[in-house]
């Protein structure tokens, strides 16, 4: 019979990073990494679709006041200064950005006047491993 192994993860490190900080303080609670952060914009309407990797933050401003739908995909949240600049560009609340950087956040949905915010877990299985992997989607 196959043996099931359970991995126990410590959650004290991520909460300890935020302890004593005022609400809205931008602290990344995920795994430390040095990988490059990649920002990709998906801009779409019922008739069009545009995908663009952003290399300069100034390129984000053209998506701010458009009438189409815009999805900002950020692969890598460890550069909090970059996340803060993106939040400033789109007038996102610091509490919302804090939720994005908290990779242990429970699923939720917040409705704002001009945008929708949700956070949830995306689950995947690596075919070459027997582990279940998950990442946060916000």
Annotate each PLM feature.
Residues 1-138:
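Peripheral, non-transmembrane regulatory/ligand-interaction domains of membrane transport proteins
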């Amino acid at each position: 019979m196959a043996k099931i192994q359970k991995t126990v993860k410590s959650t004290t490190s991520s909460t300890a990073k935020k302890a004593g900080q005022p609400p809205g303080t931008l602290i990344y609670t995920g795994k430390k990494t040095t990988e490059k952060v990649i920002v990709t914009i998906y801009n779409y309407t019922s008739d069009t679709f545009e995908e663009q990797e952003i290399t300069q933050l100034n390129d984000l401003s053209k998506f701010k006041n458009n009438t189409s739908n815009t999805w900002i995909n950020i692969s890598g949240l460890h550069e909090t200064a970059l996340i803060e600049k993106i939040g400033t560009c789109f007038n996102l609340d610091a509490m919302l950005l804090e939720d994005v950087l908290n990779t242990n956040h429970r699923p939720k949905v917040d409705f704002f006047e001009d945008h929708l915010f949700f956070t949830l877990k995306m689950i995947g299985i690596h075919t070459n491993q027997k582990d279940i992997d998950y990442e946060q989607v916000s």
